[in-house]
Amino acid sequence: MRALERAEVGEVSGRSLLHLQCHVGIDTLSWARLGARVTGVDFAAEGVATARSLAADIDPSAVFVEADVLALPDHLDGHFDIVYTSHGVLGWLPDLRRWAEVVAHFIAPGGFVYVFESHPAAWMLDNRLDTAELRLRYSYFGEPEPLSFEYRSPTAVPDREVPGVEYAWGHSLGEIVSGLASAGLTIEFLHEWPFVAWRMLPCMVEHDDYWWRLPDGLPSIPLSFSLRASKPPA
């Protein structure tokens, strides 16, 4: 868990925390080690199974739920002091308005959601370039139909890969903020950052703080953003 996120979320000890799209639960369990009572959610059965296995050794009280986040109210009860989601998650969701409704549904009165995500402007850049230059390739505003990306996944057999296709939806910063506001939440802050948690572009350089940045000589542009939005007390 990165220091920036810990600082912006604040004290979590003794508080309930719901981690949406938690993958294998590494960050979820990091919050648990800081004292939070955690529940993680992901749609991937293998990811949830791995998270439960890790929790057995780290925090047996951690709960992991296999569910589509957009249908989560059908699979999970209760409310949480903190709803958390981060690092490459929103692009997998076709409906941000529904996502915001789900987020608001699970926040307890006086609680908040914290989002740390790659910046929509960064997703416009051409990630095929090996040179230290910036070139636009994708639209900033999301389209009704998702973008498709071909990839090759490694297997247990040496030198053998399995081809596949993944799909992603673009969402502007305005869509994200307005979705949360329309769901009845109050935006506390929106911060933009010139770094990102992984190597989005081949030319990026990892610094000592483990954030990836553009190399010297290129313009400084937003690569990530963090947002906190709260539900009014009862």
Predicted segments with their positions:
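A short SAM/SAH-binding and catalytic strip from SAM-dependent methyltransferases
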Residues: 81-97
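Short alpha-helix
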Residues: 167-190
